[in-house]
Amino acid sequence: MLAVIRIRGRTGLKPAAKKTTELLNLNRINHLVIVRETPDFMGMLNTAKDYLTWGELDKETLELLLEKRALMVGRKKLDSENIKELGFSSISEMADSIMSGKMLKDFKNLVPVIRLNPPRGGYESILKPYKEKGSSGYRGKDINNLIRRMLVPGVDLNGKNEN
């Protein structure tokens, strides 16, 4: 499974890239979706490669994403009661199901887009590809480090500090 994050906004967006980001439901900066690694999705990602970054998601990072940021319809946090409604006993079991190919949009009442904070320490240059010490494009397993930097602890979903 691939994690795809939008890193640039709407201004100056090429029409093909705009259509691709709409199809992926990536309508805002720092939003994340999880997609399968198929030729169709790879073609879409290459079309919008200047505005997105993506890579292979590992199970530990996926569990962290589900625990901290996944939302049910109505902005309800994903808790043990909601997980049981979806037919799983734990977040780990749900993460296994997603890693085996099930998409977030396949789950009833689960929001398919995960909202993240900007990364701690900021992005590298968003205008350059990852291979040239930038942020856009394919980054492989390093996407997990970026996601962990974007899961800032201490901030509630409503934007208020827990302290």
UniProtKB/Swiss-Prot annotation:
GO cellular component, as recorded: cytosolic large ribosomal subunit
UniProtKB keywords: Ribonucleoprotein, Ribosomal protein
GO biological process: maturation of LSU-rRNA from tricistronic rRNA transcript (SSU-rRNA, 5.8S rRNA, LSU-rRNA); translation
GO MF entry, a single one: RNA binding
Disulfide bond positions: none
Tree of life domain: Archaea
Entries under InterPro entries matching the protein: Ribo_uL30_ferredoxin-like_sf, Ribosomal_uL30, Ribosomal_uL30_arc, Ribosomal_uL30_euk_arc, Ribosomal_uL30_ferredoxin-like
Protein family: Belongs to the universal ribosomal protein uL30 family.
Subunit structure, as described in the record: Part of the 50S ribosomal subunit.
HAMAP family linked to this entry: Ribosomal_uL30_A
NCBIfam families: PRK06049.1 (NF004711), uL30_arch (TIGR01309)
Name of this chain's protein: Large ribosomal subunit protein uL30
Species per Swiss-Prot/TrEMBL record: Picrophilus torridus (strain ATCC 700027 / DSM 9790 / JCM 10055 / NBRC 100828 / KAW 2/3)
This protein's encoding gene: rpl30
